[in-house]
C-alpha cells in the first residue's frame, strides 16, 4: 500500500466555505472520505469578500483538527485562484430564494454565480476535475456552470440528488424496520425540487421486492411527498435548513464517483436521451459508477405511472433551462 508521501495531493475546492453545509463537509474531506485514507488533500476555500473572515475561522479549526492528510488550505474570494489545479469541486455557495421571489429570478441570480465559476473551472482546473453542484437550484446551476466551461466534458459536472436518494432509503428503512444498507435499486428521477420522483419500482431489501412490502397508497400519498418535501419539513422543525445531511450526501456522491460503486445511486447528470428524457438538461437518473464515470442503468421497464412523473420533471427542467437561456 502506498504511503501518503508517495501519493499525489488532490486539490479540492469548496465554495460557500463559511456556510453551514461546508462546516460539515470540509472535515469529512480532510479526513480522507472522498479520495481515500492514503491520499493527501489540499483545500481551497472560496467565499465572497464579506465572508472571508468566517472562512478564515473555519480554516483555523481545520488546522486545529490536525488531520494527517491535510496538506494546505487556501482562502480566497478569487474564483480563478480557488479552482487553480482543482481535482474536485463542491459548489455549495448559492443565493437562497428571497421572500416573494419568482423562480425565474432565483435562477437568473444564481446564474451570475455559477456562470463565472464555470468559466474559472474551465480556465484553471485540472484535467480530471469533477464538479458537484450542491447549491440550489442545483440541476440548472450545474447546466449553467457546464455551459460556461466548454473545454470540460459536460459529464464532469453533476448536480446532487444523493440527499433525496438517502432520504428515500431512510423513509423505507423506518417504515420496514430494516437497516439502510439492506436496500438496493432505489432511484430518484428528475429535479431536486418538490416535483422529484422517488421510485421504488425496482427496489429490494434482503432479496424481497419493496413494492411487495408496502402499500401502494402509502407509497404514492405519503412516501413520495415526504421525501420530496423533507427539506421543508426539517426547516419547520429545526428552524434551519438541512446542512449536515446535505454535506454527508455530497461526500457519498463524490466518493462513489471517484472510487466507483456497483450499487445504484441517484445522480443528476447530463441527459443522453435515455428513458425518453430530452437532452440538454441535468436530470436525476439511476446510475452506477465505473472507472471514474457515472453510467446510466439501462433497460428498465417504465410504467405509465412512472412515465407521467418522469415527464413532469423533464418539463420542469426544460422550463428552468428556458428561463436561463441567455446564460447558456
Curated annotation (Swiss-Prot):
A single GO molecular function term of this UniProt record: L-malate dehydrogenase (NAD+) activity
Xref: Pfam families: Ldh_1_C, Ldh_1_N
Active site: 192 (proton acceptor)
Reaction catalysed by this enzyme: (S)-malate + NAD(+) = oxaloacetate + NADH + H(+)
Top EC category: oxidoreductase
UniProt keyword annotation of NAD present: yes
Keywords tagged on the record: NAD, Oxidoreductase, Tricarboxylic acid cycle
Residues bound to NAD(+): 16-22, 110, 117, 134-136
Family annotation (Gene3D superfamilies): Lactate dehydrogenase/glycoside hydrolase, family 4, C-terminal (3.90.110.10), NAD(P)-binding Rossmann-like Domain (3.40.50.720)
Keyword Hydrolase carried by entry: no
Residues annotated to bind substrate: 97, 103, 136, 167
Family listed: Belongs to the LDH/MDH superfamily. MDH type 2 family.
NCBIfam families: MalateDH-SF1, PRK05442.1
The protein's name: Malate dehydrogenase
Gene name, Swiss-Prot/TrEMBL: mdh
